[in-house]
């Protein structure tokens, strides 16, 4: 399951509640984001070791700024609320899961 983030507070609450969180920062106008979105959903459906969330950077510029998002799509892996890894650009499901595992 993928959760659509509605506020910075909601994202921070998820970080407090979940050890592992994978965030997809995206925008509706972004072509590679449109390709990544179904892959991110597939990864979430198959991988239960992390909470998967999406942040629309156009709707939540404050969150994008807080996490220094400058390119899209950006997928960030957090552990206990701390950024561990970051990848930019289109990613297939297997690469998203590998980003978390490696």
UniProtKB/Swiss-Prot annotation:
Keyword Transmembrane carried by entry: no
Annotated InterPro entries: Thioredoxin, Thioredoxin-like_sf, Thioredoxin_CS, Thioredoxin_domain
The organism's place on the tree of life at top rank: Bacteria
Disulfide bridge map: 30-33
CDD domains on file: TRX_family
Thioredoxin domain mapped to chain residues: 2-102
Database matches in Pfam families: Thioredoxin (PF00085)
Keywords: Disulfide bond, Electron transport, Redox-active center, Transport
GO biological process: cell redox homeostasis
Single GO molecular function: protein-disulfide reductase activity
Family: Belongs to the thioredoxin family.
Function: Participates in various redox reactions through the reversible oxidation of its active center dithiol to a disulfide and catalyzes dithiol-disulfide exchange reactions.
Protein name stated in the entry: Thioredoxin
Protein's organism: Mycoplasma genitalium (strain ATCC 33530 / DSM 19775 / NCTC 10195 / G37)
Gene: trxA
